[in-house]
């Protein structure tokens, strides 16, 4: 009787009964892997500051240039690690949001677009470690294209995941969804108008902030 009433309660609220993550160890690995990536980025910036690196005058990609710091391969490895560890997260997010909230034609489309864009962003970020400034190609064209693919994929992915969150009924992540809809896109526009390193760092920080909080909710670590 109790079980039956519980099922009916979920049906009445338009929610589906939450399901536990199938692979809890993998879930923890993905979340803590992303957290480690953030720590590695911060550590790299702090160490690089002893060689004159500054967030207000140096772009993110300059961490991967031997003209700026003596250990550019560290940044290349961080990019590859960050892209690899966060790539599977897109599928967990799509699964969790689809299971947790009532499906509609539009929500499924948003989730699919978010997952695909996220994968594109992750693959692009992995290749940022390959086509760093030291291997940027003629006129830095390879690095420029990969950067556009990477950050573009992340921003579009966050937008569609956030759109699904905001439009879902009784979602606990409304504030995070509003953040994802506004802040990354606003920073992209600001960067296009005022191309300064600090805005690029804010953009990377907003992407990492959104993904960390979303991962925490998805994986319940």
Regions found by a protein language model. Give the residues of each.
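Cytoplasmic juxtamembrane regions at transmembrane-helix boundaries
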Residues: 91-117
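Terminal transmembrane helical module of multi-pass membrane proteins
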Residues: 157-221
């Amino acid at each position: 009787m109790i079980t039956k009433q519980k099922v009916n309660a979920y049906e009445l609220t338009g929610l589906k009964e939450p399901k536990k993550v199938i692979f809890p160890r993998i879930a923890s690995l993905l979340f803590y892997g992303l957290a480690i990536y953030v720590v590695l980025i911060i550590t790299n910036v702090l160490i690089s500051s002893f060689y004159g690196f500054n967030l207000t005058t140096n772009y993110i990609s300059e961490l991967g240039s031997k003209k700026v710091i003596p250990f550019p391969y560290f940044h290349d490895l961080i990019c590859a690690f960050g892209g690899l560890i966060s790539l599977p997260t897109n599928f967990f997010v799509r699964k969790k949001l689809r299971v947790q909230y009532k499906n509609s034609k539009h929500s499924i489309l948003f989730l699919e677009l978010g997952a695909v864009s996220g994968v594109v962003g992750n693959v692009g970020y992995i290749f940022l470690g390959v086509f760093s400034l030291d291997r940027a190609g003629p006129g830095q064209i390879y690095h420029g294209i990969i950067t556009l693919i990477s950050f573009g994929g992340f921003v579009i992915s966050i937008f569609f995941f956030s759109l699904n969150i905001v439009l879902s009924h009784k979602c606990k992540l409304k504030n995070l969804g509003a953040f994802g809809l506004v802040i990354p896109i606003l920073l992209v526009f600001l960067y296009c108008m005022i191309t300064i390193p600090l805005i690029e760092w804010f953009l990377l920080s907003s992407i990492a902030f959104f993904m960390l909080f979303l991962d925490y909710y998805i994986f319940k670590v």
